[in-house]
């Protein structure tokens, strides 16, 4: 029996559990739910696509024949920053959902922006939502944070070398 259907006045698309499942099933936000290998593959593909995207622009700024090191460093830095923005977007989406899952109250709108309501979760629903938040979503947030940390460490070397050369 779904507790949300019987006890909850919140519209289905605004219920925290529904938001969690819709994120988990979406094309982009499902990346952290994949296995470590598949997740790393997606991030690497995003990094390589960003490299291809910024190469023509950076070639016009740093000609590869005259400034090859500046070109390669700037390409790596720029594509890594763009990949970092992708990871930040993933993090923000999942952190919004975990905040709604962990909260004892749910803010919702019945028909528009002018009639917002607050619903206090019953203890059964609160326990279920917090369980999902702690054991399903927090590990995903940690995975994204670790990837962002690794990416920022990888960027630090080329940034210093960019200004040296």
UniProtKB/Swiss-Prot annotation:
UniProt keyword DNA repair, yes or no: no
Localization per record: Plastid, Chloroplast
A Pfam family that the UniProt record links to this protein: CGLD27-like
Statement: the UniProt record of this protein carries the keyword Chloroplast: yes
GO CC term, one of those recorded: chloroplast
Keywords: Chloroplast, Plastid
Family statement drawn from the similarity comment of this UniProt entry: Belongs to the ycf36 family.
PANTHER family the record matches: PROTEIN CONSERVED IN THE GREEN LINEAGE AND DIATOMS 27, CHLOROPLASTIC, PTHR34214
UniProt protein name: Uncharacterized protein ycf36
Species: Pyropia yezoensis (Susabi-nori)
